[in-house]
Amino acid sequence: MRVFKTKWFAREARSHAITDEELCRAILETEQGKADALGGGVFKKRLHQNRERAIILAKGGSNWFYTFLYAKQDMSNINSQELAGFREIAKH
């Protein structure tokens, strides 16, 4: 299993005090089905004591990409256009 973060995600995770250990643990939980599967290789996972949400893209079953992070208090969910964009990225 390989876990990657975009530059933007890494900066946001650091500012929200989310550790790499927590991110790796979240991937293991995602593999166990403890995340919301949004289709097309896109997953939504709760992080940091349920305060933040991460969008994770899965590629080939062993590569995972953290791409987007948002606080639940700032944004209730991603919209359908954003979801379509994440699905398109997950294809490539």
Model-identified regions with their sequence ranges:
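Sequence-level motif detector for i,i+2 pairs with an aromatic at +2
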Residues: 1, 40, 61-62
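Arg/Lys-rich, positively charged N-terminal/basic patches that mediate binding to nucleic acids
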Residues: 1-18
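Mixed-charge (Asp/Glu-Lys/Arg
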Residues: 20, 24-25, 32, 85-91
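A short, surface-exposed loop/turn module that caps and links secondary-structure elements
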Residues: 24-51
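Amphipathic alpha-helical protein-protein interaction segments
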Residues: 51-52, 63
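Short, surface-exposed beta-strand/loop micro-motifs that present aromatic residues
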Residues: 54-58
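Enriched for short, Lys/Arg-rich terminal
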Residues: 59-92
